[in-house]
Amino acid sequence: MSEAKAPCLCVPTTHVREVLGDLQGFAARNHVLHETLWSLMADGACSFRSRDHARSGYSCETDETQKQIITYLILVGDGRLLTYTRAPSGGETRLHGKRSAGLGGHVEERDVSYTWRDGKSVPYWRGTLDMAAERELAEETNGALVFRPHDTHAILTHTCSPVGFINDDSDAVGRVHLGIVYQVAVTEPQRLTFAHEIADARWEDPQSLDLDQFEGWGRIIVETLREGRIK
């Protein structure tokens, strides 16, 4: 039997639409990003759900009533965007062989951070998203990039911040995922190495890319960068 998949954070699709409307593509939230996240992940809206049908008899991977929350990290450096091909051993199998413009990861129970409110400890979802993004970034860059600048394993300086949301209901993969987009600005991109799931990594000018080579979210990110809508 294949390795078990950890449950991941989901939000009801109806709630996503209540908060974000009929978003198709990228939406920057700028100064209201935190407030939008707070509304999206309000008390009672979020739940951790199985992705492992073989073990539980249910998988959110095919449940279009739920959106899996993905931290989607786009790496930029020297005016170029990291693109890569999804290797057969990594990530969403329905996207293998296509080029991507972001490192995407599920939010798992181990990422949950807490805050104190009304006399009790409750999940702090913005911090939880940051923890998930941090873990994904460290895993995919072999520990070279981490959020904590004092970490002795971090060999390259960078900044990382959430810049908006990405959604695409045009295919089966997109209908069960919602991306929280983080932009990672790397000072020395040429020194980065990546995990084995990241194949044929290149730093490329978004203006020169062939959109037909990219999966759905990748196309959206490239188009958004070309339009200057991610600052």
Describe these PLM feature segments.
Residues 1-192, 198, 204-231:
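N-terminal leader/linker segments that precede catalytic domains of diphosphate-processing enzymes
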